[in-house]
Swiss-Prot record:
This is tRNA (guanine-N(7)-)-methyltransferase. It comes from the Bacteria. The gene is trmB. It is an enzyme of class 2 (transferase). The active site is at 149.
Length: 244
């Protein structure tokens, strides 16, 4: 082991002994595409009212949204079209969206402003760190994870965001009865998600067949998903509720 590697190993070991969570493998690769003028303008003009920063610390949702409405958290909202559609359709809920890619954040804010959506806040940051540092336990009504990167090569499976540790983190953040809703169009990932969830303590599978659920009306059918279904591709939805 080189001196540099030895120092890194000691740093990680020391942090773990102190009870700190060290993330060793990320579930995403940050490909920073160029912002369009519209996306950049949306961020500059509306971040003050719609944006959340990791550095802001723990989120107090009633203060943030100025109401006591239930909170839905979406991890990895892409360009935000579906998230904005859901927020507009459910003004009785508050939505927080997390996305690591800035163009998607800009597009989401732009769409929300265009649709006059006021019950949505967005954050450009790693969801694992937001969950650890900013989301209080027992506060979320729903956590949504739709079409995460499947990392389909077996050697990359360790990068998949869904793991035993991750689903336990989600359980801690959900209220009793709160739902963790996942969807994927990659069958192997769906099977792995199901295995992780069925092995995790503290959850009830909402599927009548104890596996997958039909796509609920609350999750919009995306153009990509619709095209895939027309070609015979499958999509798997999973919903698990936190036990008392």
């Amino acid at each position: 082991m080189t001196e540099k590697n030895e120092k890194t190993h000691k740093t990680i070991e020391q942090a773990e002994q102190e009870g700190k969570y060290i993330r060793k493998v990320r579930s995403f690769v940050k490909r920073e595409g160029r912002l369009t003028n519209n996306q950049e303008r949306a961020i500059n003009d509306h971040w003050q009212t719609m944006g959340l920063n990791h550095s802001d610390g723990v989120i107090d949702a009633p203060t943030l949204f100025a109401n006591e409405n239930p909170v839905v958290l979406e991890i990895g909202f892409g360009m935000g079209k579906s998230l904005v559609e859901m927020a507009k359709a459910a003004p009785e809920l508050n939505f927080i969206g997390i996305e690591v890619h800035k163009p998607g954040v800009g597009a989401c804010i732009s769409s929300a402003v265009e649709e006059s959506v006021s019950n949505l806040k967005v954050c450009e940051h790693d969801a694992i760190e937001i969950l650890a540092d900013c989301i209080p336990d027992d506060t979320l009504t729903t956590v949504q994870l739709f079409f995460p990167d499947p990392w389909h090569k077996k050697k990359h499976h360790k990068r998949r965001i869904v793991s035993a540790e991750f689903v336990e983190t989600i359980r801690q953040k959900l209220k009793v009865g709160g739902v963790f809703h996942m969807a994927t169009d990659w069958e192997n990932y769906a099977e792995c998600m199901l295995e992780d969830m069925q092995s995790a303590p503290g959850y009830n599978n909402l599927s009548e067949s104890n596996d997958y659920v039909p796509r609920p009306d609350s999750r919009p059918l995306t153009k990509f998903e619709n095209r895939g279904q027309n070609l015979g591709h499958g999509v798997w939805d999973l919903q698990f509720a936190k036990k008392a």
